Amino acid sequence: ILLKNGENMGIAYALNQILKYAYENDVKWFLTLDQDSVCSRNLINTYSKYIEIPGVAIITSCIKDRNYELEDSFRENEEYRFVTYCITSGALMNTEICERCGGWDNKLFIDNVDGDICINLKKRGYKVLSLHYNGLLHEVGHGKNVKFLWKKDIVYNHPAMRQYYMARNQIYVARKYPEEFSMYKQLKKELKKIWLVILFEENKWEKCKARIRGVKDGFRLDIKKENNK
């Protein structure tokens, strides 16, 4: 099935289209992938072993990025754990639960779309299950590991427009869920991101302007009302 739009409506809108199709066609679970992601051959078979765990809304796995090193937080013999957040790509979504929670927030367009729905699900008592299993080869921007203030960090080298949405949506989601986020800490994170751009990325001025504009618009954007199904 190919669902087409006449214009770019954003990732959140497209995910809601998939959710609507799955719900109307009695599809119990559906897998979401980015265009540049490669999933392991046994991903669905592996995920299917865990779909009966009560309250699980999303199943995800460990991710390997093409450009930089990600730390494995799992203990050696740990089979899985419940987490608060996962990226959209490589996530197996429970159709009924996602529909009940109102799906994705179209106002986000792109970036933090995944974080928003994870928080929404958590607030309603549902869980995100992460498997100790390398299920996805992925690429976030053109990332690389760097040292900032003597600590290991990552810069993603996203273009200015993407930087705008990243900053805007971080502030918007923090406003949407004030019980989950400290706005003071979010603004500190944004300041750090700007410093990382200045120190390690190209097109610094355009990207910094975009992030500052994103922060301002994040405070202006009207909050989506929750679906109380």
Regions found by a protein language model. Give the residues of each.
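A short, conserved alpha-helix in the catalytic core of glycosyltransferases
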Residues: 97, 101-102, 107-140
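Short beta-strand-to-loop acidic/aromatic patch adjacent to the donor-nucleotide binding site
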Residues: 27-36
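Glycine-rich, basic loop-to-helix element that forms the pyrophosphate-binding segment
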Residues: 5-24
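A recurrent flexible, glycine/aromatic-enriched loop bordering the glycosyltransferase active site
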Residues: 76-93, 155-158
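Conserved donor NDP-sugar-binding/catalytic core segment of glycosyltransferases
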Residues: 41-72
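Non-catalytic, C-terminal membrane-associated alpha-helical segments of glycosyltransferases
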Residues: 175-229
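Acidic metal-phosphate-binding loop of nucleotide-sugar-dependent transferases
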Residues: 9, 36-38, 108
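Acidic donor-diphosphate engagement hotspot in glycosyltransferases and nucleotidyltransferases
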Residues: 15, 42-44, 113
